[in-house]
Amino acid sequence: NWGYPSRALRTKDFLYIKNFRPERWPAGDPCAINNKGELEAMHSAYHDIDACPSWDFIVSNRDDREIYPYFLKAAGKRPYEELYDISSDPGCLHNLVGNGKCTEKLTNLRKEMDKLLKKTKDTRYLDNPAQDDIWETYPRLSGAIRTFPAPLF
């Protein structure tokens, strides 16, 4: 039931993403706990992806080497930072963080992101750690609370 906090900055040629909680599942937890308190099957949840035949196919065939990359892109955990050259990689398939050729671009986009978060008083801004998890403290106003296994961290 936790959110997946991330912020993104896009320029003409690049997309920079900062994932503030990379230990979380961006598509929701992979399995849930049912009403009897029993752990459901792995890959039976991902409640932040709407049910549809294409997702059912990807989950059912995730062990296929050709399908697995799509499964990871849809449901896999993300690194703390992502950088994509959207002019040459519009599908954002190749994360350039760690690519020595993009160090200067990454540094500049980090600075721009920090300036923007500070200017907009974003609660995820690093200078305000007391507000970092404020979103986790608000009560849920509608809908059932689902139960998931405790995180392993």
Predicted regions and their residues:
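C-terminal cap/loop subdomain of S1 sulfatases and analogous C-terminal strand-loop tails that border
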Residues: 1-82
